[in-house]
């Protein structure tokens, strides 16, 4: 572990305080014996070794207790070394005093050592007692569970940190944690407090664990409860280190202001911020990738079908009627969107979602009349067939379909959000050039009401990478914080399964596994776990998630000692037996109750589970110096 100059000075302080104690004890004794009688002076002088050794140990003990927890272990080591040197000096002086008598008149060392100064002997003993107390206080408590040497019922174990350094070297670009065991640190039994550095332990100074997108699908899922430092421990550090393009969903709207200048310094990058509440926001046309005439028309038609799904709320319903209206609303949106894109009626600047909304904002009768006109005039068989469903539909049925489609595109009536997805400041394909970053400052309150806003923007960028067909400079990292707000997105599953070859890597953040199951179902959630390079868990409060982690970490074999005692008049002392039992590597209640918020468990295929720290940016000086002030948290001083 690397220490700063200040920390090294604090760690070496026992040497200075011990030397000062050795210097002051004789002066203190000479001051005390000034007015004493001769017979009293003798014992005070004799007590000098005892006082010196005891005070050296006592001063180091009290000094250690006054220091931060993560420094105490190193201070104890220095204190022990200094005390041993001091003790050896006094013992050596006694041996030197007794040495001339050894060999005379048959005197041996065994006999001569009986005449060692008792003050030295007791001083050494009492000093080591104080040092033992210091060691006990500074050493973290170890687990009472005794692992068996034989893995009869399982041999699950945590990944060795050397192996972790090989898999996740410190010189990578995507920061996932810090290479140290929080549960073995001095502060393991103290809750993590961001404003109290004494609770940080080795956090902020340990080497980083980083991912180079060099194994598996390159996708990642992070689970952390509310207030679990998802943004500060992973999103911000990664934005400071990843040199490729980033598309970042930020419902808290705090990330871009913190990292935009750091991103711009990385090779003169173009940092685009999509913020509907800012006058300086950029905008683009989310349909621009569908307007590329170099792509075959049949493929563009298929893309329109998939994109239309992003506009609809994908809430699962057991009501067959609601399911029917949702399906037909999707068909209606597909037909109208295809008309907007392919019809000669519109200029290129009008081929956007505003035009789609303008059609749907008409009365039902006007929409039906326009659909009939489209059916009669369009040369496209695809559009004609899609529209034909609705021209002969019963009025009441069409009313339900129209209401569903109108409701799910209602957000396009909000001018600032409509402008965001219907502009021309840049193209979605720009992210393939390797020099463009996009931050989506979409407030959580808006995404809760209109998740389609986030879906169409992210979907446009994902589809732009597919359209690029492997023609990209660097892999695009999609950092989707609070991705649960977007609801179900089929395109995310497509990116998960085929995104690696198209240059997309997903970094998804959920509060619990239940959110993943809610949108993708049990089978879908299993597919996500199987397809990701790794899954990280931290700050878990949900019992079911804790049970899932416990099961995935595996079982180990432990030794259990049983003791039986005899009662009554029996003279036997009882018996003791040892048996082997199965135990989870970590139990659900240990995950919820004992794991600190700056600790995480990382699971990946083919390797043992990794238990390590989290790279919270404000604990690391180099990261803190690179970021701007976070308006949601007090800023520590940069040094």
Swiss-Prot record:
InterPro entries per record: P-loop_NTPase (IPR027417), T4SS-coupling_protein (IPR051539), Ti-typ_conjug_TS_TraG-like (IPR014135), TraG/VirD4 (IPR003688)
Topology with respect to the bilayer:
Multi-pass membrane protein
Is the keyword Membrane assigned to this protein?
Answer: yes
As for subcellular location, the record says: Cell membrane
Q: What is its main location?
A: membrane
A Pfam family that this protein carries is T4SS-DNA_transf
Q: Which residues cross the membrane?
A: 13-33, 49-69, 75-95, 118-138
Keyword annotations from UniProtKB, A to Z:
Cell membrane, Membrane, Transmembrane, Transmembrane helix, Transport, Virulence
Query: Which Gene Ontology terms of cellular component type are present?
Result: plasma membrane
Family assignment?
Belongs to the VirD4/TraG family.
Function, as annotated: The type IV secretion system VirB/VirD4 is a major virulence determinant for subversion of human endothelial cell (HEC) function. VirB-dependent changes of HEC include massive cytoskeletal rearrangements, a pro-inflammatory activation by nuclear factor NF-kappa-B, inhibition of early and late events of apoptosis, leading to an increased cell survival, and, at high infection doses, a cytostatic or cytotoxic effect, which interferes with a potent VirB-independent mitogenic activity. These changes of HEC require the T4S coupling protein VirD4 and at least one of the effector proteins BepA-G.
Q: What is this protein's name?
A: Type IV secretion system-coupling protein VirD4
Species per Swiss-Prot/TrEMBL record: Bartonella henselae (strain ATCC 49882 / DSM 28221 / CCUG 30454 / Houston 1)
Name the gene behind this protein.
virD4
